[in-house]
Amino acid sequence: MSQNGGKTPTSYKCNRGDMWLNWDWHESRGTFGRGDKLLINFASVSDGTSNTMAVSEAIIGVQNSRRVGEAIAVDTSIIADTIPPDHPPSLCLQLVGPNRQFTGTIQGPGSLPGWRWADGRNPYTFFYPMLPPNGPSCGRSGEDWCLLTASSRHPGGVNVLVLDGAVKFISETIDAGDPTRTTGLTSRPQDYSGPSLYGVWGALGSAYGKESVAVP
C-alpha cells in the first residue's frame, strides 16, 4: 500500500481562516472546519461572499523533497509547547534556508501536503491565510498543529476561489500583516474576534472579522 493509504491526492485546500489550529479543534475563522462540530453557511459570512476565500490551489507534496511548497517543516519549539495557537507564523519562516529549502527536519512521507483528498486533517485539505501565498508550511509532527499555506507552481502567486464563485489570482506580495504577531489566546481561541492580525490576506480568510477589504 502507498504512503497515502491508497487515496488520491488533492491540489486544492479549504480555507480554515487566520488562526493556527489543530485539525481536531472545533473553531474556525474561515469558511471550512470540522463538519461534525462546526456549521458555516452563507448567512454566517458577515464579511461578504465576494471578500471571503473558500478554496485555494495547493502544491501536492513530493517525497524526499525539502523545497517550500512540497514539504512541511517540523518545528521543535512547537513540539516543546502543548498550545501552539500562541505561536507566531514567523516560526515557519525561520526554517527556510537558501533556494527555498527547509534546513531542518521535515515531515515524513505519510504526511505530505495534499496527500489524501478525503482526509480532513491540516496537511491534506486545509490552508491558513497567515503567511503569504507560496510561503513555508510547518507543524509539530505528522498531522498535528500544521500551519499550511496556499501554494502553486505559478510564478508570483496563487489562484483562489471566493465564495461568490469568482476565481482571483493573489500575489505573493499581498499585505499579510506582521507574521510575528499571535492571538495570545492559548486556552480560548474562540475569543479571537474582529479584524485579522494578518493584513489583507488574513482578512480575505476570515469569514466574520468585520473587515472592509476586497480581493486585490
Short names for language-model regions:
Residues 1-19:
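Surface-exposed loop and adjacent secondary-structure segments within mature catalytic domains
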